[in-house]
Amino acid sequence: MFYEIAQITKVLISPVSWIVLLIIIPYFLNARRKWLCRSCWIVAGVMFLVFSNKPLMLYTEGQLAGEYSNTSMKDGKTYKAAIVLGGFAKMDAERGNLTYESRRAGRLWEAVRLWKMGRVERILITGDTSSSLKDGVTTKPEFIKYMTQIGVPDSVLIIEQLARNTRENATNSKAILDSLGINTADCVLVTSATHMRRSYETFRKAGLEVDYYASDTYSAPKSLSFRDFYPRWKCVQEWQYLFNELFGRIIYDVVGYG
């Protein structure tokens, strides 16, 4: 039930939903309420200008990332596993390749980079939607084959497919690590910088004494030009991700997950 409510809420808090709703509402209002129609369109226009503003979006992203844009990994330490939060791609079973989510794909590649550098021994991917289809048929073999083709052997990978949210990422990961006899203090959590605070606090609350390493880190632009303020529809869509994270933090604090 918690998962279903979260999915519905994502739609309700989306700036895209607000703008579209304000545009279409006037068509269902009485023609005599022209002032209300105009008001809806004006508000929709103002919201579009605000949420299509890239500098504002980047500033908000930086505030959400905060101190978690850095890493708490210890110099010279080799970790038993990197725990990567899923949702970064979808698996095309017919073509055997991945379609990446632009904001999340860095999680996987940073974990692979850490492994190639010898900083981690294994990679645990939790809540990996790229390895399962809607009808429940697993594409895990295709995913492992793909990773093998890019140089990551299957012996390195641990794939957990059941987690649907950050809380389940934590509890399911702990169960797997405990079964393998891996101390969670020897693991590092890898996810997006804006998602790291909620993830890290949730994992710690679930009993995982992990360090963290953020991907997709934020860096403030050194200078701004007039063109930086041009409206961008992509920015409106990306606010969805930021609102989801902000709302998620509030909910996790309320229910005691974080």
Predicted regions: what they are:
Residues 218-227, 235-258:
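Extracytoplasmic/luminal low-complexity segments enriched in Pro/Gly and acidic/polar residues
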Residues 1-29:
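Membrane-embedded alpha-helical segments of integral membrane proteins
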Residues 39-53:
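Hydrophobic membrane-insertion alpha-helices, especially the h-region
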Residues 50-232:
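A structural signal for short, hydrophobic/glycine-enriched beta-strand patches
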